[in-house]
Structure formats: C-alpha cells, structure tokens
C-alpha cells in the first residue's frame, strides 16, 4: 500500500515538472499547509515506559541490569558515549561497553567516521548502529539522575551541559571574526573570492512541518570565518529565524542546485502566506544577485586533500630537547595538522602535533645537511611499512646568501622565547648553521648543555634586531637575574662585550595580512600543540600578532606571526572534525590565576603546556550544515571573475 502511494506521488511530481518550466515548486504544490501528524513525527514520539526511581533499568550491550539501591558504579564508553553499569563494561579498565568499541577506538575508526560524515559520505554500517544508542544513553542518565536525587534527598536542578557555539559567541559579544582570506594555509584560503554579505545560497528549510526535507533560499547577513549568519528570503528585516551554519558544509549549495537536483523549494511556514506568487518574488529578488560558484563543493573537497599520509617519516623538533631533532612517523592527518609519533615510541604515546607547513618539521636528512643536532634512532626499530616523506612536501625557506656580513656567534638580538611564547627576550646567537639557520639561546636561562637552544631561520619572523621592543612599545624580558633595571641595551652590550646583530639581516617584509585587533579566530596553544582554542587578536605589531586565549589570563597569550599555520578561521575545527577548546569557565580562570601566582612554569618542561589544559576537556564538534540552490531559469550563472557568481534571469 505504501509503495502504491509513493508511485502515485512520484507520477504527480513528474506531471507538475512538465507543467512548470522553472521546476521550482515541484514539492510545494503537493505539500500544502497540512497540519496532520507526519510519519516522521510519529516515529520521533516513541512511547517509552516510565522508569521507577527505585529500580532504574540500564540496558548495556544487549543485557539489562538493575541496581535497587542506585549506588552501583556507572561508566561511559569512550568510543560511542554509551552510559551503563561499570561492572558490565569490557576489559579491566572498564573504558568500553564492548569488544567492538574497544577495537574501533584503537583503530581510530571514530575519527575516520567523523571525517567521512563531514565530507558528505554516507555513514558506515557501524555508524548506523551507533546512531541508535543516544536513547539508551538518555535513559541511563535519567536513571542515574533519579538515583542521585533519592540518595541526596535534596532537590537540585540538573546541570545542563551545552556545546560551544561560535555563532552565539560572536552574536552575544558583538565581535567580528578574521576572514578566511587571512589564512592562506586553510581550506579555501586562496579561493574564498567574493563570498560576502548578500551572497545567496540554498539551504534546508527548518521552518516547515512537511515530512520530507525541503529547501529555501537564504542570504548571508554576516560572515564569521567559515560560518555565516543566514536569513531566509522573504523575512526582509525580521531576524527571528536567522541561523548560523558553516558555508563549506555539505548542505550548502549555490542557487540553482535544487532545480538541477530535483529538490523542492518551499517557503518557511511563518511567511508562507506573505506572497501569493513566490515564483515571481524570487525571480525579482534573485536576478543579478550573487551566489556560490557551481563547483564550490568540489573546491572545498579539493582544498581538504593533504599530501602527507600515515606512515611517512619526517624529522621534527625533540619536544624534550629543543636543540635537536628526532625521526617521527605520521600517525594521522586532520585538516592538515599532523599527529607525529616519535619513531622509538613503542606504545605510540610519545607524540607531537604540528601543521604540515610548520617550520618544525623537515625531510629525513635535513639535520645532517645543515649541521643541526639529531637524536639517532635504533635502526632495528624502524618498521618496514614506514617510508620517508618526499622532500617537495615541505615548506621551502627563503634562499639566503651567507656573505661576510652574516650573523656570527655571540651576536645579540631579541627573540620570542620558545618556552614562554608570551615573552620576547634578550637572546644570543649560539651557533651558525648552513642554509641560513641559526641556533638561538635565551640569555639568563640557558641550560648548561645548550639543550634549550632553538633553531630559527634567518628569515624567521620570530627574531628581531636589538631595539625592536623599545621602538614598538613591547615589554622586553631581560636576562634572568639581571639587576640593572630598567634594562638598557647599550649598557648590556658594553657589560657583556657583545655586538648587536645587523638590522639589515632581519626579515622586514610585512604582508597585507588583513587582521584587525579584536578579531576572533581559532588558534593552537603552541605550549600544548594538540589543542586548538577560541582566541582573539589583541595586538598587531607589523606582522606580529598577540593572540589571547579567551577565558584565560593574559600571561597565557602568545606572539604569533600573521602567516603562521597555527592560526585558523572561525569554523575550521567544525569543518575538519578537529576538537575545539571553548573559553575557560570563570571558576577555572579564577583558580588558574591563583595557581599561576604561586608557581611559574619551569624552563625544564618544554612544550608540556599551560595549566589550562587540566581544566579543559576535549569536545567533538559536529558539523551542522545547510544546503542552497534555485530554479532552473536562474541557475544560469555568470562569473564575475573573482570567485562568486551572478544569477541572471532566463530571457
């Protein structure tokens, strides 16, 4: 009977397509405002038997358990998020609800599943099974909550845990985000074009009571990185149904996509009776308007293809001894960020995160070629499946001719402290390497064996000539233990018998980066490089940016170059499936302030991270996209030569 009805609907749909030369309202005519309950709503309102508070029931891995006293231990599966009785969980550690979840976690299938969904691929068979579990998890949480209330005999409101939303954060703080064009290393960074306010797209219509997925046209009201605040056509100045979405998401399309894909365009029911002829309204509104290029989704997909692959071997800085490099193997690639596992790590827990364009990674043999210190790896531990990453994959540094007036050992300069990125310090050139590389030491805090010397290229934007901080009104950190304050370079050079490095040898190029003070972005905490956090640009000195991590003290700020591959547009984590660290709660900030006053970071703990990572929990951000297009008559588009397309009416 159901099949007969579907065939009849399909036949009726085909007939309407023949009558309508535009093909726009193929789903609208047959979907008049019908307030009768749909099959989808019937399915969603599934009856669930109430759970007695005295005898909560937990279904775990196919088994049903009860705990009359409500005191039995609970556990949450680290793979699928299922809540259940701890004793029924798998393995001694009770971290997983089943053998399947344990193995899936180890094989990193969760990450692959997330990336597949973000890229618009259909879910795997396992993913479909996991989608059925949230109901069980809710039942378990409800049962645990009821049991807790009974034991405490105190009426307390449940704590609501909400995920961080960039859209709400931008709106509530009335701030702006750095545009995607500021990040050339990010997806679409080089082809963002004229994607701006006013561009029209087609997205799912969420203001509809129809049982099927329908679409409507929206305009970009505000841009925040990859995210856009959209407003449905027809709402004029009414912002009541405005919503945020990621423009690069799988549900966002150029105007014309619905017509070519046979998807219905249906106006939101809130304004459904505002116009009698919606077709004429859209033609008038959209003729001459801009939309996304037809191959926009293809460009997004192509920009998220990365040349580095798992099992590739590279040389990377040793996070325990900054003066040397070690061999590491690419374990995974997310959004261009590499998780590198040091080759001699047997349990694969000794790792390091960086972007594929980072100056901290190099091809195998780089250290030997320039005279850099290198920790040798036991050749017996090298796995046959690993292979050296091709040299052309790495970022090329500027070719420099080291003449007679080149940097020399003992010369003084100013440099960002790699162990305290909020400080620019008095520094000394300790060794001159080949190809323009220098080993730099921070005066007053160097290890006796030079293990904390750091390698900077002469063109690095992280080293500066003597006097840079004074000229730009930046606080210069004097050598530890130096008592003649305020610090004066002239006196210090005379006392140490040193000379300043020539100003002409430093990088003076300042690109038109587009950053402005107050702009929001996502930034890597370089002291714990696996974390990407909500951040703000608080100061700009030429090409140098002062990055503040929202919710944390200023002492955690970091100086970063404007072209750093550790900065990303708002929405990058959501797009790539990476985990975004939200601003720290005020309580954590206060406690952290007290801790920081009592205990300063030790110089012997490089890249261990600030205390803030103990208070933050990694949270998965799921992509929430929306799709957009237009009628066939307006699907003919003209490129304006700059990335966006104009919509023209068919003659």
Swiss-Prot record:
User: Which sites bind Zn(2+)?
Assistant: 77, 80, 97, 101
> What are the start and end residues of every segment in region (Disordered)?
21-55, 581-610, 629-651
| SUPFAM superfamilies the record matches | Tudor/PWWP/MBT
Entry GO CC: NuA4 histone acetyltransferase complex; nucleus
List the subcellular locations: Nucleus; Chromosome
UniProt KW Nucleus keyword: yes
Q: Write out the entry's keywords from A to Z.
A: Chromatin regulator, Chromosome, Metal-binding, Nucleus, Repeat, Transcription, Transcription regulation, Zinc, Zinc-finger
Q: Does the keyword Cytoplasm apply?
A: no
Q: Where is the composition biased (Basic residues)?
A: 597-610
Q: Which GO terms describe its biological process?
A: double-strand break repair via homologous recombination; regulation of DNA-templated transcription
Q: What Gene Ontology molecular function terms does this protein carry?
A: histone H4K20me2 reader activity; zinc ion binding
**Composition skew (Polar residues), residue ranges:** 632-643
Which ranges does the UniProt record give for the MBT repeats?
A: 164-268, 276-373, 374-479, 487-583
- UniProt xrefs under Pfam families: MBT, zf-FCS_1
Record InterPro entries: Mbt, PcG_chromatin_remod_factors, Znf_FCS, Znf_FCS_sf
Source taxon at top rank: Eukaryota
Zinc finger map (FCS-type): 68-103
**Low complexity bias locations:** 29-41, 586-596
User: What's the chief localization of this chain?
Assistant: nucleus
Which parts of the chain are coiled coil?
Answer: none
Subunit info here reads: Monomer. Component of the NuA4 histone acetyltransferase complex.
Tell me, what does this protein do in biology? Answer: Chromatin reader component of the NuA4 histone acetyltransferase complex, a multiprotein complex involved in transcriptional activation of select genes principally by acetylation of nucleosomal histones H4 and H2A. The NuA4 complex plays a direct role in repair of DNA double-strand breaks (DSBs) by promoting homologous recombination (HR). MBTD1 specifically recognizes and binds monomethylated and dimethylated 'Lys-20' on histone H4 (H4K20me1 and H4K20me2, respectively).
Q: What is this protein called?
A: MBT domain-containing protein 1
The protein's organism comes out as Xenopus tropicalis (Western clawed frog)
């Amino acid at each position: 009977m159901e099949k007969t009805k579907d065939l009849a609907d399909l036949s009726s749909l085909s007939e309407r397509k023949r009558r309508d030369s535009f093909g726009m309202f193929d789903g609208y005519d047959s979907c008049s405002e019908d307030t009768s309950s749909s099959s989808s709503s019937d399915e969603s309102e599934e009856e669930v038997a109430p759970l007695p508070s005295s005898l909560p029931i937990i279904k775990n891995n196919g088994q049903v358990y009860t705990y009359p006293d409500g005191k039995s231990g609970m556990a949450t599966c680290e793979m699928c998020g299922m809540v259940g009785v701890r004793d029924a969980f798998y393995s001694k550690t009770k971290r997983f609800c089943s053998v399947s979840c344990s193995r899936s976690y180890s094989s990193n299938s969760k990450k692959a599943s997330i990336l597949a969904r973000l890229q618009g691929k259909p879910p795997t068979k396992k993913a479909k099974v996991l989608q059925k579990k949230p109901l069980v998890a809710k039942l378990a949480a409800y049962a645990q909550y009821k049991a807790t209330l009974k034991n405490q005999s105190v009426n307390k409101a449940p704590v609501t845990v909400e995920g961080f939303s960039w859209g709400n954060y931008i709106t509530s703080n009335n701030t702006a985000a750095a545009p995607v064009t500021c990040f050339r290393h990010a997806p679409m960074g080089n082809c963002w074009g004229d994607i701006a306010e006013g561009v029209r797209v087609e997205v799912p219509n969420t203001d509809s009571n129809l049982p099927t997925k329908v679409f409507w046209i929206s305009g970009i009201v505000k841009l925040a990185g990859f995210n856009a605040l959209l407003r449905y056509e027809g709402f004029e100045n009414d912002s009541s149904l405005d919503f945020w979405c990621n423009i690069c998401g799988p549900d966002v399309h150029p105007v014309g996509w619905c017509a070519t894909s046979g998807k219905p365009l249906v106006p939101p029911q809130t304004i459904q009776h505002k116009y009698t002829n919606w077709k004429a309204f859209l033609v008038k509104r959209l003729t001459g308007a801009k939309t996304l290029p037809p191959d926009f989704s293809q460009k997004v997909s192509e920009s998220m293809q990365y040349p580095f692959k798992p099992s590739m071997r590279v040389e990377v800085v040793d996070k325990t001894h900054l003066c040397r490099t070690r061999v590491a193997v690419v374990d995974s690639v997310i959004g261009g960020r590499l998780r590198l596992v040091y080759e001699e790590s047997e349990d694969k827990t000794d790792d390091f995160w960086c972007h594929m364009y980072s100056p901290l990674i190099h091809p195998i043999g780089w250290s030997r070629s320039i005279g850099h210190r290198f920790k040798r790896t036991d050749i017996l531990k090298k796995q046959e499946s690993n292979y050296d990453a091709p040299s052309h994959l790495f970022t090329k540094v500027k070719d420099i001719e080291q003449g007679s007036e080149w940097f020399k050992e003992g010369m003084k300069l100013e440099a960002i402290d790699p162990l305290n990125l909020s400080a620019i310090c008095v520094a000394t050139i300790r060794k001159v390497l080949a190809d323009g590389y220098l080993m730099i030491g921070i005066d007053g805090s160097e290890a006796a064996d030079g293990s904390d010397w750091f390698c900077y290229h002469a063109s690095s934007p992280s080293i500066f000539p003597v006097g840079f901080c004074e000229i730009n009104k930046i606080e210069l950190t004097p050598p530890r233990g130096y008592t003649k304050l305020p610090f004066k370079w002239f006196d210090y050079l005379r006392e140490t018998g040193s000379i300043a490095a020539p100003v002409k040898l430093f990088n003076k190029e300042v690109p038109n980066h587009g950053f402005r003070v107050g702009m929001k972005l996502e930034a890597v905490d370089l002291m714990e490089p696996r974390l990407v956090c909500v951040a703000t640009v608080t100061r700009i000195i030429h090409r140098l940016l002062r990055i503040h991590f929202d919710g944390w003290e200023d002492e955690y700020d970091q100086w970063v170059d404007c072209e750093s591959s550790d900065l990303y547009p708002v929405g990058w984590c959501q797009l790539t499936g990476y985990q975004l660290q939200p601003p720290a709660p005020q309580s954590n900030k206060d406690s952290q302030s007290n801790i920081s006053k009592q205990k300063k970071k030790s110089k012997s703990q490089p890249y261990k991270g600030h205390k803030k990572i103990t208070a933050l929990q990694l949270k998965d951000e799921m992509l929430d996209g929306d799709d957009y297009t237009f009628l066939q008559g307006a699907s003919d588009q003209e490129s304006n030569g700059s990335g966006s397309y104009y919509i023209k009416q068919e003659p």
